[in-house]
């Protein structure tokens, strides 16, 4: 691949759109690009041939749905800074119902963790998991289950932004926001625009694609969020020789405790935000993560668990990378990685 040197200003894409005043200095890259990885070929047969008009006023086209299809590949975009300081690539994996946009920008137009970690000198690989975004999804002939869609109220009430059930309102003035919450509520409507359907039966395909990415890019550092906790720990257990560190940001799912010993040589940081005791589900989900961390320690692993309020970082929702203090949390993660000898 031909390498080239250039500087770009990564401007935000959320409303308020194209707001360079909220962005940082131009980012100097030695390269950037994208690719797809993983996937499989399936065959569909026995379906009727249809004639469709594919565009208004167009000429009808005969569409035969029978044949071979490429499915379950994953889209990955990478950014390689000119002044590299991270000793290994940093892979960012998003949570459920979301895409790699999670890390690209914030709902109110500030830098996301993608930009922040590039500026800190990390080669960053940001992906859309199988079934999401530019990775696409398979037809109902391949995936038999139905996708799940989120209402606008659901993340507000479930991601510890609002005060729980009934706290969202179509009138922003009537929203019941948790006191001191750092999520940019003024941009909540923009946040809901990035939500995509999710399936509950595609875990094997997602894990297969993430494993293919690790095989292609690593050794590396894994940074994953929420639903990707289960994927990240599972892939690390399968490829422990390729993972140099794990950063688990509010993992909603943990790994297999019986396999925790496989991560013995991988330094791991687990980060939790605020308001967890006030939520109906998160105390249990955090306990699952803590139990897995204990299993890792029992097996000889090194795990640091940070509850942000306990270190003076308060007000974080489940979407820490979007909160108004996202830079402070990014600094904490980067310092931890640097202290582990993984960045200069």
Language-model-detected regions and their locations in the chain:
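Conserved alpha/beta-hydrolase
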Residues: 110-136
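Short beta-strand element of the alpha/beta-hydrolase
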Residues: 86-96
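Gly/Ala-rich beta-loop-alpha elbow adjacent to hydrolase catalytic centers
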Residues: 223-232, 236
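Conserved acidic catalytic loop of the alpha/beta-hydrolase fold
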Residues: 200-221
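N-terminal cap/lid segment of alpha/beta-hydrolase-fold proteins
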Residues: 22-85
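Catalytic active-site module of serine/aspartate enzymes centered on a nucleophile-bearing elbow/loop
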Residues: 313-315, 319-344
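The feature captures the conserved acid-bearing segment of alpha/beta-hydrolase catalytic domains
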Residues: 248-308
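Active-site glycine-rich loops that stabilize anionic/oxyanionic intermediates
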Residues: 94-106
